Amino acid sequence: VRITAGPFKHACDLNVKVLLQYDTDRLLAPFLREAGLPKKAETYGNWEKDGLDGHIGGHYLTALAIHYAATGNLECKKRMDYMVSEFARVQQANGDGSICGFPNSKKFAEEIRKGNVGIVWNYWVAWYNMHKTYAGLRDAWLYGKNEKAKKIFLKFCDWGVDVISNLDDRQM
């Protein structure tokens, strides 16, 4: 469905105007940091620096994909494709399929793999945070028609399954 006129088009245009004010490199900074890659910009403050680092990146990717699908806005597509490419670099640098922006995400996954599920209480909603990235990649694939996003998403899913594969029902 393409939105071409009326109040929904006006609302989409306002959304896109706001979306294009964000700096994608600032949104990607937590993911690059966790992958050991040099940041291209400093991360945003507040929640993006206080333990929930990276959660806006997934929301943003979803918004870009939806607005590209609904309006055909090429700047949304360009930014979506850029974020997907950067997530591919992060995933490759991590070497295990993960794409996480929250602090000490590798330690989190190691502890969960060992069955130490109590570690979740030391993190600010880690699974929620990762879900935003999962959803953003899924939306870039399904709505934005980005095939690279599909590959990255599925590899990230495989990583998530691997992290929890040894947990029993009680631990889940």
Model-identified regions with their sequence ranges:
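Glycan-recognition and catalytic cores of secretory/periplasmic carbohydrate-active enzymes
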Residues: 1-172
